Structure formats: structure tokens, C-alpha cells
């Protein structure tokens, strides 16, 4: 009998911030750690592939969809905090901007940069998301993860997670984040931390195209360079491929103008890479996770 939170033939476009992608053969939406363990076990018993969707940012799903089980973590949210010690534990599906606001109201310093990141705690940990010179690894103590292959659960400390720019051991080993522990700095006033948080949010709203569907930043920044600046200097703002467009607001964003497909996005990424390589001699590396492509 099917787990009640696993459903067949579900459209995935609405679960991504690009609003793009085909169907999942199966879709699981766990609400707690026990349910995700059951869903991974369900997939393992049937020998089918298991893919994770967090907030759906930084994600491109094939127009033809995904074979196997897609697990969307959005319903698996919640957190506990101690405003005396600054210890915060959040479930993987907790939206990062929500957590940033909640801890700010408790006078906890350390996540102000995260208020404009359109992702979940789990997704941010997997790719070591960051902004304004800070990143997820800065305040992380440990992550509880599950292996989809073995079903084993581990708590991995920060030093063993091999964090680097937009990389982690979790990403390399294809582990699934269940929850994350952070150590934030207590003792600040709510007003002070909220003010800093709001300044970061307003900066992002002024400089990034939040009014249109996008995945967030498309390319990793090369060493000591900004991908957006490189693309802008080549005059590529506004470049279109089908319904996909290089944002006129920030060149490291590709926006969906209403009817973009994964094929449009893929082709536009390729065009940008070729133009940058021709001019600068290196290939910009996407930070977008691709699902359903072979």
C-alpha cells in the first residue's frame, strides 16, 4: 500500500522557482523525519531513483520530467532555538528567509545575510549557499543526513562536511539533509539584528529580479570575479532564447518570461558559456542542479 504522502504522476513546475519542468513518476511530500525515512525505504524496495526538491530554487527539471521518486521537502519545516546559548536546530525544509527573520527577532546574530536566499535550510547546506561575504558553513555545527542507498542516518560535524564555495560533502556523496544545527551569536538587541536583516533584504530586492520566476544565481563566480559582471560586460542583458531571458536587472539571473522551457534555459546557458569562453578563455560553471537530464 502506498504511503499516503506518495502520489503518482505529479507536475513539478509549480514546485520550482523557475516554474519549469515536467512530471515526476512519483512525488513524496514528507512532513517529518519519520515520513522521509519511510519514503526512501519505499523507493529502495522498488529499486527506483530518489531525487530531492527543497524550495525548488537553484533547480532545473527536464521538460520530460523525472523517473522514480521526487521528494519535496517543503512540508518538513520547523525549528527549535535557545536564545541564551544561540543554538538553533532546523528541519531541512524550513525556508531559510523565514529562519533568518525568526532568529533576528530573538536577537541572534549570524543569519542576516540569508533573508533573501530563496531556499531551504537543507538546500542551503548542500550547496553552502551564501551572500554578502557570508555562507551557510560559517555558523553550522552539524547536519543530520540520510543515505538514500543504505537508509543509514548520520550526524556529520562541520569539519567533516568539506565545505567550500558552493560545495559540500553532502553534494558529492548525494546524501539527503534531515536537519541542521547552527550556533548563532546571542545577546544582541532584536532591533539591531532585524535592522541589519532588512537592509540585506532591501539590497537584494533592489538589485535582483524577484518579480519574475528565476532560480537565483545561475553561474558560480570564478575566482576573484563576478559572473554577473562578466555577462553584463559582454552586453548579454536581455538576451532571449524562447521564453528565457538574461535578466535586465542582474545578468547572473535567467528569468522565465512566461512560457520558458528547460530546453530554452539550457540553450541560453550554453550561449552565455560560449560567449564568455570566446572572450575570456574560461567556461562559467552553472551552480544550478539539473534533474531528469541524461
Curated annotation (Swiss-Prot):
Residues 19-187 form the FAD-binding PCMH-type domain. The active site is at residues 166, 217, 287. GO terms for biological process: cell division; cell wall organization; peptidoglycan biosynthetic process; regulation of cell shape. GO terms for molecular function: FAD binding; UDP-N-acetylmuramate dehydrogenase activity. SUPFAM superfamilies: FAD-binding/transporter-associated domain-like, Uridine diphospho-N-Acetylenolpyruvylglucosamine reductase, MurB, C-terminal domain. Its EC number is 1.3.1.98. Its cofactor is FAD. Pathway: Cell wall biogenesis; peptidoglycan biosynthesis. It is found in: Cytoplasm. One of its GO terms (cellular component) is cytosol. PROSITE patterns: FAD_PCMH (PS51387). Cell wall formation. This is UDP-N-acetylenolpyruvoylglucosamine reductase. It comes from Prochlorococcus marinus (strain SARG / CCMP1375 / SS120). The gene is murB.
Amino acid at each position: 500500500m502506498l504511503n499516503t504522502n506518495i502520489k503518482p504522476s505529479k507536475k513539478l513546475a509549480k514546485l520550482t522557482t523557475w516554474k519549469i519542468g515536467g512530471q515526476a513518476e512519483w512525488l513524496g511530500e514528507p512532513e517529518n523525519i519519520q515520513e522521509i525515512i519511510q519514503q526512501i525505504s519505499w523507493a529502495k524496495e522498488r529499486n527506483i531513483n530518489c531525487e530531492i526538491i527543497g524550495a525548488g530554487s537553484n533547480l532545473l527539471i527536464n521538460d520530460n520530467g523525472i523517473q522514480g521518486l521526487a521528494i519535496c521537502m517543503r512540508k518538513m519545516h520547523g525549528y527549535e532555538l535557545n536564545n541564551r546559548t544561540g543554538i538553533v536546530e532546523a528541519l531541512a525544509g524550513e525556508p531559510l528567509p523565514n529562519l533568518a527573520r525568526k532568529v533576528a527577532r530573538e536577537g541572534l546574530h549570524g543569519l542576516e545575510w540569508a533573508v533573501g536566499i530563496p531556499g531551504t535550510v537543507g538546500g542551503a547546506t548542500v550547496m553552502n549557499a551564501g551572500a554578502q561575504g557570508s555562507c551557510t558553513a560559517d555558523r553550522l555545527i552539524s547536519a543530520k543526513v540520510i543515505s538514500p542507498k543504505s537508509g543509514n542516518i548520520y550526524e556529520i560535524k562541520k569539519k567533516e562536511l568539506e565545505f567550500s564555495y558552493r560545495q559540500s560533502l553532502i553534494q558529492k556523496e548525494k546524501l539527503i539533509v534531515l536537519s541542521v544545527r547552527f550556533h548563532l551569536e546571542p545577546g544582541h538587541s532584536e532591533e539591531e539584528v532585524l535592522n541589519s536583516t532588512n537592509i540585506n533584504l532591501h539590497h537584494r530586492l533592489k538589485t535582483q529580479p524577484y518579480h519574475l520566476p528565476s532560480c537565483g544565481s545561475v553561474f558560480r563566480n570564478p575566482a576573484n570575479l563576478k559572473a554577473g559582471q562578466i555577462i553584463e560586460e559582454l552586453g548579454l542583458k536581455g538576451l532571449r532564447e524562447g521564453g528565457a531571458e538574461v535578466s535586465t536587472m542582474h545578468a547572473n539571473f535567467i528569468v522565465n518570461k512566461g512560457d520558458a522551457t528547460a530546453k530554452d534555459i539550457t540553450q541560453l546557458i550554453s550561449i552565455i558559456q560560449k560567449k564568455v569562453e570566446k572572450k575570456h578563455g574560461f567556461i562559467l560553471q552553472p551552480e544550478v542542479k539539473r534533474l531528469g537530464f541524461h
